């Protein structure tokens, strides 16, 4: 189901002809490098111009720990309409995250603290986070980051199949 994206995890126009899906972990060094060097160029050239819709999917590399907690924090921020500010804040830490800092990040981006704390402490989005990881595994990804290029309307076809791109690739390869 290529239309079942979480609205808070999408950048770009819904009618963009191409969708780029990233499977990533907030603690992954290569994912941080993509965020710092490739993402700004992709956003300026393709997403902001309406050519590509960008979808972020969680792929924490472990079943517990700070990577999972960061994914939960981003989803809880998304529940308050602030997914991308939390996403950017987490990646701006350069992969050096500590679970004790997430509630402070929530405050700095203007989240309602009680609702965020309840969501975070109850790990409300854990199941969907692990579903993202299973989906990445079905695409053949066993590490992060991984990307899928796919037609936005109608999904892949025999003539225009989805393209899986494993690993951190430079901007020029997109």
Residue ranges and their predicted role:
Residues 8-9, 32, 89, 163:
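Flexible, active-site-adjacent loop/turn segments at secondary-structure boundaries
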Residues 37, 103-174:
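C-terminal cap of thioredoxin/glutaredoxin-like
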Residues 5-6, 38-41, 134:
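Alpha-helical scaffolding within the catalytic cores
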Residues 10-11, 97, 165:
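Short clusters of hydrophobic/aromatic residues that line enzyme substrate/ligand-binding pockets
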Residues 2-18, 46:
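A short beta-strand-turn-helix
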Residues 16, 21-107, 112:
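Structural alpha/beta surface segment adjacent to cysteine/selenocysteine redox centers
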Residues 4-5, 22, 91, 159, ...:
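A generic, residue-level signal for flexible/boundary positions that often mark functional hotspots
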């Amino acid at each position: 189901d290529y239309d079942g994206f979480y609205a808070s995890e999408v950048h770009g126009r819904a009618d963009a002809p191409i969708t780029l899906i990233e499977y990533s972990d907030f603690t992954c060094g290569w994912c941080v490098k993509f965020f710092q060097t490739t993402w700004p160029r992709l956003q300026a050239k393709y997403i902001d111009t309406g050519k590509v819709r960008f979808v972020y999917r969680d792929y924490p590399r472990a079943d517990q720990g700070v990577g999972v907690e960061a994914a939960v924090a981003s989803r809880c921020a998304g529940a308050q309409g602030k997914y991308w500010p939390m996403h950017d804040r987490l990646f701006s830490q350069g992969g050096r995250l500590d679970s004790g800092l997430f509630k402070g990040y929530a405050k700095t981006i203007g989240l309602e603290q009680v609702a965020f704390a309840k969501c975070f402490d109850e790990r409300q989005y854990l199941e969907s986070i692990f579903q993202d990881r299973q989906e990445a595994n079905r695409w053949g990804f066993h590490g992060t980051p991984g990307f899928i290029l796919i037609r936005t309307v109608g999904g892949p076809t025999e003539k225009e199949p989805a393209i899986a791109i494993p690993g951190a690739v430079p901007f020029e390869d997109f």
